[in-house]
Amino acid sequence: MRFLTKFLLFLATVYFGLKYACESPLRAQYPQLQLACHYSQPALWNDYLLKNSPAYKNSVHPQLVVAKGKYEELVQPHVKDVCKRVHTQLDRIDKKKYCDLAHSYANLAYQKAQFYYSISAGKYVHDFCKSDLYNKNLKRHVERAKEDLSKAYHLAVVRIPQLFTRENVEKFTSSASAYINEKTESLKKEAKQITSDVKKTVESEIKKRTTSSESEEEPIVSTSTIVKTITRTRHSSSSTTSTKSAEETSEKNLETKEEEDITDIEIDHQAQLQRDFDKWTSNIDKKVKMVNKMLVRDVKKHLKPKIDANDKLFKDKLKVLHKEANDNFQLINKAIQDINCTQGIDPETGKQIYFDSEGKSQIEKYITREMIRTMLNDTQTTLNSLVADIENDVSKILEDFKKIAENSREQHLTTFEEWGDIMINEWSKKLAYLDVLAPHEDAEHEGKSKTELSEKNWKKFMAIKKQILDARDKMAKRQIKISEFKLLLDNVQNTLQAVTNENGEYLYILRAQANLAFQERERLEKEAEEAKLRKEAGEVNESSEEEQIVEEPISA
C-alpha cells in the first residue's frame, strides 16, 4: 500500500511537472516535449475512448461530464483563487537555493545508486550487455532511449531554471518598480501638503501673538538649560515723575516674579529629565541590538572565506571516503565470490591451482577465513581513519569560529563599555548640576520636596547604570549563531553519520555472506573427502575378497 501511494504521488508529480513545462515558452523548441504534451492531454484520450470503447462511452463518460460540471461550479473558483495566491508567493521566492538543494539531493541519490549498483548488480548487467540477446535485439532500443533521456535531462536541468531567473524576475521587477514609484510620488505629495499646512498654522499663530504682545508685554528669553519665557511689565518711558516708593514696590514685584519663574524652571527641568530618562532607557536597548547585529555581521564577514574553503574541502574528502569504501567493498565482494572455487592442476608445473566458481578464470590464491577477516578489518580501519580525519577538520573549524567570535565580541564589548562609561559620566554630571542649580530645598513638584525628587532621580540613574551593566553581561554570554556555518557543520556531521552507519551495516552483511560461503565450501569439501574415503574403502574391500578367493584353492 505504501509503495502504491508513493507510486501514485510520483505519477502526479511527473504529470503536473510536465503540464507546467507544456505551458512554458520552451515547448516550441523541443519536438519530444511537444509529443509528450500531446499524449498527456486528457481530452485526447477522452476522444479516443469515446470512439473505440462503448463501455466508456455509455457508462464512464456521462459520469465524468456530471463530475466536471460540479467541479467547475464548486471547486474551480476556489482553486483559481488558491493558484493565484500560490503563484504570487512563488514569484517572491528565491528559487535558486531550492534548485541547488534539489540538485544536491539528486547527486547524493545518484552516488548511492551507483554505489549499490556496482556492488550488487554491476557484474550481472555487465555479463548481460556482452550477451547475444542484448547486442542483437535490445541494444538499438536502449541507445535510442538513452538519447531521448539525455535530451529530456537537458530540458529539465538546463532550460527550465531559465523560467525562474529571466522572464519571471524581469516581470516581477518591473511591476515592483512601478508600484514603488507610485507610492513614492503619493508620499511626496502628502508630505508637501502637511508641510504647507503646518507652515500656515505656525505663521498665523506667530502673527496673532506678535500683535497682542506689542500692546501689553515685552518677551525676555532666559538661556538656561530649559528655555523659559519670562515677561516683565513694560514701564512707560514717559513716567519720569514716579516716586521712590513706587520704584521700590516695582523692584519687589520683579523679584517675586523672578522667584516664581525659577520655580517654573525647576518644574520644567524635572519634566525634561523624565523625558530624557525614557529616551535613554529605550536608547540602551537600541544600542544593544545594534551592537549584536554588528557583531554577527563581522563574524560572518570573517567566516565567509573559511566556510567556502572548508565546504569544498569537506566535499572532496567525502568523495574520497565514498570512493575508498566502494573500492574496498568491491574487492571483498569479489573475494567472497571466489570462496567457492574449483581446483585444478597446472600442466606445466604440476602444482595445484584454483579457478573461480564458474571455472573460467584463475584466481591468485586460495581464499581463507583469515584473508577475509584481514580484508574486513583493514577496510574498517581505513574508513575509520578517513572519518576521524574529517572530524578533526570539523574540530579545527569550530576552534577557528570560537576564536573569530571571541575576538569580534571583545572589540564590540570594548566599544559598548566606552559608550556606557561616557553616558554614565554625563548623566552623573547632569544630576549633580541639577542638585546645585536648585536654590530652594523646600521647592515642591507634584507634592514632593526637592530632596525627594533628587533621590528619585538618582535612583533612576542607578537603574539605567544597572541596565547598561546587565546588557554588557548578556552580550558577553550571548551565543553567536551563524546560519551558514551551522548548515555546513550539520551537513558534514549528518553525512558522516549516514556514511558510517551504511559502511558498518554493509561490512556486517559482507561478514555474514563470507561465513555462509565458507560453511558451504567446507560442507562440499567434507562431502568430497567422505566420498573419496568411501571409494578407497570400497577398493580395499574388493582387493581383499580377490585375495581370499585366490587363497582358498591353495589352502585346499
From Swiss-Prot:
One GO BP annotation of this record: sporulation resulting in formation of a cellular spore
The annotated regions of Basic and acidic residues compositional bias extend over 190-208, 245-256
Record bears the keyword Coiled coil: yes
Coiled coil residues, start to end: 135-201, 481-547
Write out the annotated subcellular location. Mitochondrion
According to the UniProt record, where is the region Disordered? 190-263, 534-556
List where Low complexity composition bias occurs: 220-244
Q: Give the GO cellular component terms, alphabetically.
A: mitochondrion; ribonucleoprotein complex
Q: Which UniProt keywords apply?
A: Coiled coil, Mitochondrion, Ribonucleoprotein, Signal, Sporulation
Signal peptide feature range:
1-21
Oligomeric state and interaction partners are given as:
Component of the mitochondria-localized RNase mitochondrial RNA-processing (RNase MRP) composed of one single RNA encoded by the NME1 gene and at least 31 proteins. Absent in the nucleus-localized RNase MRP (NuMRP).
This chain's function reads: Involved in spore wall assembly. May be a component of the mitochondrial RNase MRP (MtMRP), a ribonucleoprotein endoribonuclease involved in the cleaving RNA transcripts to generate primers for DNA replication in mitochondria.
Similarity-based family:
Belongs to the SHE10 family.
User: What name does the UniProt record give this protein?
Assistant: Outer spore wall assembly protein SHE10
Native species: Candida glabrata (strain ATCC 2001 / BCRC 20586 / JCM 3761 / NBRC 0622 / NRRL Y-65 / CBS 138)
